[in-house]
């Protein structure tokens, strides 16, 4: 447990009916007695008290709750004071708590103490922040599942299988005189393949969680007057970009945020891509290329009446952008032709003006980025995906060592590193730098 005692306001800034001050640490109970005039508190019971300044002047009345460690969120003694939600009153309670021996908590320090005292793992700690910041009902439900341990259980079960395989492999290395040749034993290969399959399944589910948490950066690109601004207006359901017949109207980056089946979609409209001598337009085009290189997905909007635009610009995009960025070609202005809306894997025919084909576009976007709502069972972060990818790469390397070289020692080392990488997800093995980065992004009172 920590030596010092921390205090912070646990409710959002501003005025409200109720404001909560949270205290955690060895002096929490003594500080509460200083604030409530030495009125005894029973664990897990709300006690109505007058709250005093150091000079015994009453500053408010409210409820005081006492959670005795280790049976509390942080694992330490916790006091929660529910006072009136006046910023002045709450600030005075903070000052009096500090005068009585507490210090102001760092962002996320309550959750950090819960993690360090083994009350929650790192996934659950992150889920607290994700639940607070959830942008949709689905994201909130998935964050709650992570907080309840759904994601952690999957990682822990995977680790248990990996530990068993490590024990089997390392025991066979340590006792080579045994009659069984583990390198040619199909059991090792089967176990390893099963673990890789389970890891891929969890990775797919985690990817859905990342999409729900972080959303998707969707950049709209194309030649001038292809209908990019009309498209962003239609996707947003309101006029966010100026639309005229004058080529080059959009000269700067335009951003809009919407929900696409609970996926936060960060839409970015860009200047028309062409050669220009206009200094302002050239700067807009430069910024457009910067956004394109950071995109999760690109919509290449093409005027269907000028299809020759498509090939040259599509080739330029493919040569310039990383291969991992998918490009959806959107043939716009079908309302000026006899064509109807349709789509395939990376192509959509629509009218941004009338909205015909917009549903098909949304469907293709979800398919291209791999969104499968039936698979999303918990919220996840990019660091989780990176760890899962790294663990898979190590397991595949180990599989190669076993299959091609019969190198048991090298297989054992790859299994050890994969196990350690997976443990970083839950925080069993985690650097102090990563912990600092994660918890510093929390609210002060969390």
Swiss-Prot record:
Q: Which amino acids does the record list as binding GTP?
A: 225-230, 244-250, 269-272
Output the superkingdom of the source species.
Bacteria
Q: What class of enzyme is it?
A: hydrolase
Assembly, in brief, is: Homodimer. Heterotetramer of two MnmE and two MnmG subunits.
Q: Is this entry keyworded Cytoplasm?
A: yes
Which amino acids does the record list as binding Mg(2+)?
A: 229, 250
Keywords attached to this entry: Cytoplasm, GTP-binding, Hydrolase, Magnesium, Metal-binding, Nucleotide-binding, Potassium, tRNA processing
Q: Which NCBIfam families match?
A: mnmE_trmE_thdF, PRK05291.1-3, small_GTP
Q: What is its EC number?
A: 3.6.-.-
The record, for Pfam families, names:
MMR_HSR1 (PF01926), MnmE_helical (PF12631), TrmE_N (PF10396)
| GO CC aspect terms | cytosol
The TrmE-type G domain, residue ranges: 215-370
Where does it localize? Answer: Cytoplasm
Binding sites annotated in the UniProt record for K(+): 225, 244, 246, 249
Q: How is the cofactor bound?
A: Binds 1 potassium ion per subunit.
| Biological processes, Gene Ontology terms | tRNA methylation; tRNA wobble uridine modification
Name the UniProt record assigns to this protein: tRNA modification GTPase MnmE
**Which GO molecular function terms does the record list?**
GTP binding; GTPase activity; metal ion binding
